Amino acid sequence: MKVLTNGHFISCDDENRCFSVMIIDRDKIIFTGDSVPDTYAGCKQIDMHGLTIVPAFSDTHMHFESYALFGTTVDVREAQNFEAMGRMLNDWIDAHPNAKFLPAYGCSAHTVAEKRLPETADLDAITDLPLLIVKYDGHAAVANSALIDLFPSDILADPGFDARTGWLYQNAFYKGVNFITGKVSPITLLEGMQRAAEALAEKGIGYIHTVEGVGYQNDIDIDTINIIRRGLPQKYTVFFQTMDVDKVVRRKMTHIGGCFSLALDGCFGSEDAALSEGYTNHPENKGFLAYSQEEVDNFCIRANRAGLQITMHAIGDAAVDQALNAYAAALKDYPRKDARHILIHGDLMNKAAIQKAAELGITIAVQPAFLDWPQEPAEYLESILGERAAQILPLRDMVDAGLLVTSGSDAPCTIPDPIEGIHICCNHPNPAQALTPEEALKTYTLWPARSAFDDNLYGSLTPGKKASFVVLDKDILSIPKEDIRTTKIRGVFLNGRRFRPSERFSMPELALRILHNFRED
């Protein structure tokens, strides 16, 4: 039993309650109010010293296993030129003399002195170890000659593979990532998952939606996350990235979709997000749609009939329209009162699309970090989109239309950081689209839990829900919105226990936690 007093507790519930006392028993909240009930008067009290306490944060779109994998290798986002990038890569190689390949992450033309992306020749000058660097946006990658020599013929023959530069786009990219991630040992992945979960907890994240399924043989990555998630400190909701509904049903999973095979278009960084009007710098280019409308409709109809919750990637307005049309077709074919299907990204949504999404009950899973992204700066977006750049992520319009809006990172594309995300939501580059601090906080707490039918246990500081919360040094609802990002985390509690980064579980302890939580399930 813990009796927490003298705190500024922000419930994030629908009534926006605040209070000064919260009592927890094991992993559940059992009381909230402004005075300690007589029943608990004899219990030891913990003085919160006026600090602010909010529900544990959520991240409603990430690729957790990819984030975990790249956390074990090299992130080159901070490299200021190719020489520095080479040093980072070779430092890792020197520290891992038995490595047979290196998957790295984060290159961008906008953050290096060369002002271009590295090509095969640049990578060959760095190492002859098979090397793949995934671009910062997670939608393209470049390989060195040593890796290209290992690629199977279907990658080399794919139209998305550029043999001259070594770059892989669209389907070639997905095949290339599948090829290299399929060679990662389960132990490496498991260790990476533990470290990744710890990094997320340090940021106050206790509730996660992850999209998984990137080509491991027999979908072992799906089975791995479905087991290991039970031993990690957060709550994980797993979406299977497949269009094969039977695979999901056989595993008794209830969520399908994501990116990869469910990416309806590309991204702005590769200028292949699907647009209704051409790119400003290349008017003849409207990006690409990965599927026909009929193909997407048929998938959504099958998944919706199976009672699954669907999520799909759509960045450009043409892809957004395709996704909404498919959801409409599925719900017309088999009406479900509360399906809560999800559209990931929704970067370019006009008011008609927003209204249609609201009528269909679609959740929009946005990534606020895209609005302040060094690897994809505003000047670049303006150069390719013109005036449309000011309409990226119209958060105000979405919330005003009654849409359920949830926030995430798309990790490893951006580094998960909910406080930074709340700051960006409140300081939108287009001030007309900014959210209030209360709304921004709910995109990281209550609304994510509600979007996946978990608001009975997560998302607010309410009796009966999980005792997962974050202690902050500032009241982010009352400080100037320009100062929100200066807020520091003073403590993280997950399921009633204080999280301490030094308390990494041993393999036997992890196994015991998995077994215990299997029994609870």
Question: Which residues fall in each region the model found?
Answer:
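Extended hydrophobic/aromatic segments used for targeting, binding, or gating
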Residues: I222-C259, M349-Q355, E359
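An anion/phosphate-binding loop that grips the pyrophosphate of nucleotide cofactors and donors
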Residues: T60, L360, A467
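Flexible loop/turn segments at secondary-structure boundaries
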Residues: H110-V112, A140-A141, I208-H209, G215-I220, ...
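Active-site microenvironment of metallo-dependent hydrolases
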Residues: M1-R26, I30-D38, G86-A95, P186-E202, ...
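Non-cysteine beta-strand/loop elements that form the S-adenosyl-L-methionine
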Residues: H63, I256-D272, I362-D372
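Divalent metal-binding segments
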Residues: K2-T5, I10-D25, I29-Q234, V238-M243, ...
